[in-house]
Amino acid sequence: MSEARLMARDVIKTVPHDQVPQPPVASETPSMKEPVRDVDLMECVEGRNQVALRLACIGDEMDLCLRSPRLVQLPGIAIHRLAVTYSRTGVRGIFRSLIRSLTNLRENIWSWRVLTPGAWVSPDQDPGQLFPMVLLVFLLLGGAWYLQLQ
């Protein structure tokens, strides 16, 4: 049976030297006394550039493989969701959803402007801000009217 003894805070002082395992020694390791061959700096730089280029190519390939199928599906998903909303609620539901989305967008823009007060733009400074919104509403109304006629 082992005997109970006090342990020091430093574990190395507690364990006798003959009980400490020695690190394994490899037979073919070069000693520090052997001269290290000179490494050509240009070889390292060229090799590093090739590795970086190869890693960039691998990253681009992974990006294309993983992201492309999802990006291709987005327009189809948007049309499908619009069709489902139209079939469930009709044109009024689409307009209600559009108005709710635009209201949420306006509230989000307002909250960001409150957080960054230096970025405020008064309406008379840029009258062209209204044009894209009017164009978007006009296109959506035209598309809904086209769907109603079919």
UniProtKB/Swiss-Prot annotation:
The record marks G143, A144 as: Cleavage. This is Bcl-2-interacting killer. Residues 127-148 are annotated as: Leucine-zipper. Keywords: Apoptosis, Membrane, Mitochondrion, Transmembrane, Transmembrane helix, Ubl conjugation. It is a single-pass membrane protein. It is found in: Endomembrane system; Mitochondrion membrane. Accelerates programmed cell death. Binding to the apoptosis repressors Bcl-X(L), BHRF1 or Bcl-2 suppresses this death-promoting activity.
